[in-house]
Amino acid sequence: KTAFDIASWIVGSEMCISDCVYWEIGTKAADYDVLLRWWTQYAAGRPLFIGEDIDRTVKFGQQAQKRALSQQMPNVKGTVLWYAKVAVDDTGNYGTTLRRDYWRYPALQPQMPFIDKKAPKSPRKVKPVWTSDGYILFWTAPKGNNWDDVATCYVVYCFEKGEQINIDDPSKILAVTSQTFFKLPYKNGRQKYTYVVTALDRLHNESKPVKKTVKL
């Protein structure tokens, strides 16, 4: 077993993998497409976070192609941007495209069931309360004793009247918070909304949802 024997040292490891695939699609010596498929094949089911050279991606106009290719791979769970300042500086509209098209909504971290897959219990006593600071949705942390069943943060979703409750839709996430309250955007008390709160453990296993309908 050597540092280059990827298929050997990954097996049995409790880890995720961040591989540096800095080249572009079509590079003769190191094709991004070929390398991505290779890593997917030998990742042993571990989540992959692809290291991407933003300058190269922008230079060859391959942002959309690389995103589409990554989305085809079931265990590619994210991207490591190198270097991040290029995205912040919005070189080639890279950062704008991320915010507008790919990363528009909040996201939960990828799950790692090979470490722990048991979800925490649901939040308790979810209740909207009028306070001097406005209309607040409060809840109580679920009971948990060990690191793998204690809630570390919560997800707050909002659905309009008549909408199907679907916590797999990230556009409905209003907040991921470590607080046990959320300030509601009260308007005139005429419109019904259903707020959903779930608990996350430190590996982001998500509890069953708790619903509360309020008029805002």
Predicted regions and their residues:
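Active-site clefts of carbohydrate-active enzymes
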Residues: 1, 21, 35-66
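Single conserved hydrophobic/aromatic residue that forms the stacking wall/gate
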Residues: 2-12, 16
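Solvent-exposed loop/turn segments at secondary-structure junctions
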Residues: 22-27, 54-57, 84-88
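Short S/T/G- and acidic-enriched coil/turn segments that sit immediately N-terminal to beta-strands
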Residues: 177-183
